[in-house]
C-alpha cells in the first residue's frame, strides 16, 4: 500500500504516512456505523457491502482499497462484483512466514498461530458498543488463497510477498504495468518516480 500510495498520490515519490490514508481499508467500520441497523451479528454488515461500493463508484473515478477479506459470499451477500471492482492485486506470502508473523503480532505460540491459519471461521471484527460495525471474513489461509487466485470475475495479479521484499523494483514495476493495463492509462511509467518510491519505502 505504501508503494502504490506514494507513486500515485505524491508529486515526487517521497514517502509520507499521510499518503497511505489515500488508500482506505474496506470493509471497515466507517462505512457502516451510520446505518440504523442493529448489527447484532458480525456478518450483518455484509448486506451492505455492495451498496457501499456502489456509493463509492458514484464518484466515477478509480479508487484503490486495501482488504483482508476473502473473495466470498456471506449469507448470500457478495463481497464485491464486476460492476464495482475493476481488478485486484493479491499478495501471497509463504505460509511458514505467515505463522511466524502471526505469532509475533499476537504474542502467541507458533502452534496457536498455525491453528489460527487453519480456522475456517476466522475473521476480523469491529464492534462499537453492542453493534458489530465491521467484519472481514478471512477463513483459513488456503481458502483465502483460493478465493482470490481462482477468481475469474476480473483481472487479478498475484504477487509473492517475498518477491516484493527481495526484488522490489521489478515486482513493483509489474504492479504498475498491471494497473496501467486495467485502467487503460496512456501515460508511461515514471521510472525515476518508481525508483524513488522504492528507495523511500524501504
Give residue spans per PLM region.
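Surface-exposed loop/turn and secondary-structure junction residues enriched for glycine/proline
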Residues: 148, 167-168, 201
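PAPS-dependent sulfotransferase catalytic core
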Residues: 192-202
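Phosphate-binding beta-loop-alpha motif at adenosine-nucleotide cofactor sites
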Residues: 152-178
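Non-catalytic, well-ordered alpha-helical segments in soluble enzyme domains
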Residues: 9-10, 171-185
Amino acid at each position: 500500500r505504501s508503494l502504490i500510495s506514494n507513486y500515485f498520490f505524491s508529486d515526487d515519490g517521497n514517502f509520507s504516512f499521510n499518503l497511505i490514508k489515500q488508500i482506505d481499508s474496506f470493509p471497515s467500520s466507517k462505512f457502516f456505523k451510520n446505518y440504523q441497523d442493529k448489527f447484532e451479528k458480525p456478518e450483518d454488515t455484509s448486506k451492505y457491502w455492495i451498496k457501499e461500493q456502489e456509493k463509492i463508484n458514484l464518484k466515477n473515478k478509480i479508487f484503490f482499497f486495501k482488504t483482508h477479506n476473502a473473495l466470498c459470499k456471506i449469507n448470500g451477500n457478495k463481497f464485491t462484483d464486476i460492476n464495482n471492482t475493476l481488478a485486484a492485486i493479491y499478495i501471497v506470502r509463504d505460509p511458514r512466514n505467515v505463522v511466524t508473523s502471526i505469532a509475533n503480532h499476537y504474542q502467541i505460540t507458533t502452534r496457536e498461530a498455525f491453528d489460527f491459519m487453519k480456522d475456517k471461521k476466522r475473521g476480523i471484527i469491529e464492534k462499537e458498543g453492542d453493534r458489530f460495525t465491521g467484519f472481514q471474513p478471512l477463513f483459513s489461509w488456503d481458502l483465502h488463497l483460493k478465493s482470490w487466485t481462482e477468481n475469474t470475475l476480473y483481472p487479478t495479479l498475484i504477487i509473492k510477498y517475498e518477491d516484493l521484499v527481495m526484488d522490489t523494483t521489478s515486482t513493483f514495476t509489474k504492479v504498475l504495468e498491471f494497473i496501467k493495463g486495467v485502467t487503460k492509462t496512456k501515460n508511461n511509467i515514471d521510472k525515476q518516480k518508481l525508483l524513488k518510491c522504492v528507495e523511500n519505502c524501504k
